[in-house]
Structure formats: structure tokens, C-alpha cells
């Protein structure tokens, strides 16, 4: 289910429903986590999300285990998407944006989001060519960003 541009209250109701269906309680700590994701364009590791919450809302009493459990639940419910970053683990973002792909710098970890209608069309053509019903995809391109390229003099 794609949740493009949902208003926060609609997103929160969906979140509460998913928690109920998963046999979990709605808590203020979980809402703080959802609100933090909603109001940010950052791709978070569980640890960086935890630190962001602790810094922004020190009285929220959110534990790292709650962050991990809630992110897993949100990912299963397709409310967040994750990017696999090899040994660095996963980074998460809320799924309420229009579809986009990612370029990930292998040096600094910078993530650049992009949209390209030609790539999207080509993927559909390839799927049709193989009689494959495309329901979604996640594209991650790895390389070296321009900042790191200038610093290390690596040729792209």
C-alpha cells in the first residue's frame, strides 16, 4: 500500500490500527518515533533515530528496543522502507513520499534521492517483456559522491 502524502492524523490512525492488529499497545513513545520520522527527510539507522528522539524529546522515555521493534513493525506494514547499507545495517525512511530511488556514497554514506521517468518506464517494459506483473521495486546505486570524489581525487 502506497501512502503518498498522507496527513499526519491519517498516518497516526493507520499506525494505531497496525499496532492493534499486531497485538501491541499504542504508546506516546511510539508516537514520538512516528512523528520524528514524519517531520524529517533523514534516512535513520535505529541508533540515529533513537539519538534524535532523545535529543529532541528528552522526556519521552523512548528505549532503543522500542525503536527497533517499532521500525520492524512499520517495515512489515510498509509504512517505512529500509535501505540496506552492507555492514552499516539499515537506514529507514517513512513511506509517505512519492516513489524515488537512491544513490549511496560508499565513502561517507550520503544518500541522494532521485526520480527518473526513463528508468521507471524501462523497468515496466522489462517486466512486461517477461510477462511479469511489477508491484514495486527498490533501486540503490552505490558509488562515490561529488564531495568525496573531490576530496579523494577518485575518478568517476
Swiss-Prot record:
Region (Dimerization): 97-156
InterPro entries recorded: FUR, Fur_C, WH-like_DNA-bd_sf, WH_DNA-bd_sf
Chief place where the protein resides: cytoplasm
Entry's Gene Ontology molecular function annotations: DNA-binding transcription factor activity; transcription cis-regulatory region binding; zinc ion binding
Keywords of this entry: Cytoplasm, DNA-binding, Iron, Metal-binding, Repressor, Transcription, Transcription regulation, Zinc
UniProt xrefs under CDD domains: Fur_like
Residue span of region DNA-binding: 1-96
CC annotations in GO: cytosol
Entry superkingdom: Bacteria
SUPFAM superfamilies, alphabetized: Winged helix' DNA-binding domain
Localization in the cell: Cytoplasm
Chain sites annotated for binding Zn(2+): 43, 93, 102, 105, 108, 113
One GO BP annotation of this record: negative regulation of DNA-templated transcription
Keyword DNA-binding set for record: yes
Bilayer-spanning residue ranges: none
Residues reported in the UniProt entry to bind Fe cation: 99, 101, 120, 137
Keyword hit for Transcription regulation: yes
Family: Belongs to the Fur family.
Summary of the function given for this chain in its UniProt record: Acts as a global negative controlling element, employing Fe(2+) as a cofactor to bind the operator of the repressed genes.
Subunit: Homodimer.
The protein's name in its UniProt record: Ferric uptake regulation protein
Gene designation per UniProt: fur
Amino acid at each position: 500500500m502506497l501512502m503518498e502524502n498522507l496527513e499526519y492524523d491519517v498516518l497516526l490512525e493507520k499506525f494505531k490500527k497496525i499496532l492493534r492488529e499486531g497485538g501491541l499497545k499504542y504508546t506516546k513513545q511510539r508516537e514520538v518515533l512516528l512523528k520524528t520520522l514524519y517531520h524529517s527527510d533523514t534516512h535513520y539507522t535505529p541508533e540515529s533515530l533513537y539519538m534524535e528522539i532523545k535529543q529532541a524529546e528528552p522526556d519521552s522515555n523512548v528505549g532503543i528496543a522500542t525503536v527497533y521493534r517499532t521500525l520492524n513493525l512499520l517495515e512489515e506494514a510498509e509504512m517505512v522502507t529500509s535501505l540496506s547499507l552492507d555492514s552499516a545495517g539499515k537506514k529507514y525512511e517513512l513511506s509517505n513520499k512519492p516513489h524515488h530511488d537512491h544513490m549511496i556514497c560508499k565513502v561517507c554514506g550520503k544518500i541522494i534521492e532521485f526520480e527518473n521517468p526513463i528508468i521507471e518506464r524501462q523497468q515496466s517494459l522489462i517486466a512486461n517483456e517477461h510477462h511479469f506483473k511489477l508491484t514495486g521495486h527498490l533501486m540503490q546505486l552505490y558509488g562515490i559522491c561529488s564531495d568525496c570524489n573531490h576530496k579523494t581525487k577518485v575518478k568517476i
